[in-house]
Amino acid sequence: NKNLLLDAGDVTHGTTLTNLFNGETVGVLLDMLGYDAVVPGNHDFNYGKDRLIEAAKIAEMYSNLRVLAANVLDETGKQVFQPYQLYSYDGFVVGVIGASTPDTATKTHPKNIQGLSFMSDEVVYGAQALVDEVDKRSDYVIVLAHLGLDEDGSVGITSKMIAENIDGIDLIVDGHSHTVLENGMKVEDTWIVSAGEYMKYVGVVELKVEDKKVTNVYPFLVSAAEVKDPSTSELAKFVGITEVEPDAEVQAYIDAQKKELAKITEQVVAYTPVRLEGERADVRTRPTNLGTMIATAMKDSTGADVALTNGGGVRASIDVGDITRGEIITVLPFNNTVVLVEVTGQDIYDALEFGYSQLPNQNGGFPQTAGMQIVYSRFSAVGNRIKRVLINGKEVDRKATYKLATNDFMAAGGDGYTMLDRPVLMYGKGLDEVLTEYLVQHFKK
């Protein structure tokens, strides 16, 4: 077996099948599929650090899977996860180092990572010694990274920065920014590969090794469609796979989990005559009907003057037709709670300026709002984009106080909204529950 199977993070959270079982189903499947290593992404902390650390320990005890992250430290400065792992193939040794994004500090609820630090700039400027150590013990060095390639400010430390500033890395297997690199990219002497999002692709890197030296590197992607008919794909050409049959044991496990899940998710709660837009590129750049509906549900459930929630918390659209409980959980998978805080008019302006600051680029913190009318110019300088804000047709008084409904993630300063980190006046219901009640009230079939 000369294959190395890796995942670049955010693997344990995001689908209903995963979320309702707190990531357990994915852990079982990773083991069944023979994964060698994963790096924690920001969403892998969504069930809390203790559960992730426990899962890593269980994986190490009972399987070959390793959870790798060199830059996640506890309060004493000790590494929480194993920093790297060596793999030998007929004497050819591959070293794999894990690197989690420092963005996690603002991309999951603070309570999920309490006591942890992610070394931030040290990921770039302090990692040379670790790479040198692994380089001495191996013939090929891979960084398994949940860092991303965005250069628009939404991602701080990028894999490209790693490649440019650290010597000795042969390959970076990257995640976080959902970037699709069909044949990878070369930065300095380092290859970077990234396979997009949501299992639309499987990334493959073929290494040709002669006398313990890599003489050729060929990265490519295999689409989901090609897996269904691999005879004409790169799988057939380079890996020799011409047909893919479902693994009976894996399929049986998935079917059993889906059966349990169906008891919850197939319940129809409402009907929509229009598509409710929650696509990533939409909710992170503009108001959408689904984003506005969620914010309106938050406002109505708390009696707030206005509501604001982050577009990055909306994870899917809802098509025309019946709306099931499962679809709502898929749209809002983070188990967030609606909270009520008191803010000033200036806080509202500051929050909106911050939320609109990265346009036209996508931003998980883009505000989906209700109860206010916003006049803005995306072409104005950052910090001067919000021209007017009206509540009930009246200009917002910057010195007055208002009740604002948001989610507990943002009320803790999540996504960088430090101006909303205010004492909570009221803890409401779960965000998915609030949306469900709104749909039942206004869109009951």
Where are these regions (language model features)?
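Short, mixed-charge, low-aromatic patches
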Residues: 6-12, 114-115, 159-163, 245-256, ...
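Short, flexible loop/turn elements at secondary-structure junctions
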Residues: 91, 101, 196, 268-276, ...
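Immediate post-signal peptide segment of exported/extracytoplasmic ligand-binding proteins
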Residues: 88, 207, 269, 273, ...
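A short C-terminal boundary segment appended to hydrolase-like catalytic domains
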Residues: 105-106, 209-323, 412-414, 421, ...
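Feature captures C-terminal
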Residues: 64-71, 75, 82-84, 186-190, ...
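Short N-terminal signal/transit or membrane-insertion segments
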Residues: 16-37, 144-152, 235-262, 329-343, ...
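Acidic, metal/ion-coordinating pockets
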Residues: 1-234, 283-297, 307, 338, ...
